[in-house]
Amino acid sequence: MYISRNLEQWNAFLQMLKIAFEENKAQEFLTLLLTADERDAVGLRLQIVSQLIDKNMPQREIQQNLNTSAATITRGSNMIKTMDPDFMQWMKQHLDLIEKN
């Protein structure tokens, strides 16, 4: 699994993110820290992961559908390979629920 270059800062971010969600401030917190382009990139990464998990289409088709680079799709695919299978099943379950709504 990927380990942040500065684990202390990453953990501080995760703690603040948790607090922001608990206090219903996640939108403001992430808007403060992420530019519009970064928020779009996170959304794109989520779409990539969702489509890669489904395994219904080749990476090239995902690339064309999402209008992104092959390298971006490959980064998502490579990260999935490093993740615990139980976590990826959890992701799929929740992504499926989101897509149904």
Swiss-Prot record:
Subunit field text: Homodimer.
Instruction: Extract one GO BP annotation from the record.
Output: regulation of DNA-templated transcription
Q: What does this protein do?
A: This protein is an aporepressor. When complexed with L-tryptophan it binds the operator region of the trp operon and prevents the initiation of transcription.
Molecular function (GO) terms for this protein are: DNA-binding transcription factor activity; sequence-specific DNA binding
Which regions of the protein are recorded as binding DNA? 59-82
Alphabetized HAMAP family for the sequence: Trp_repressor
Note whether Amino-acid biosynthesis occurs among the keywords. Answer: no
Please state what the protein is called: Trp operon repressor homolog
Q: Which organism is it from?
A: Haemophilus influenzae (strain ATCC 51907 / DSM 11121 / KW20 / Rd)
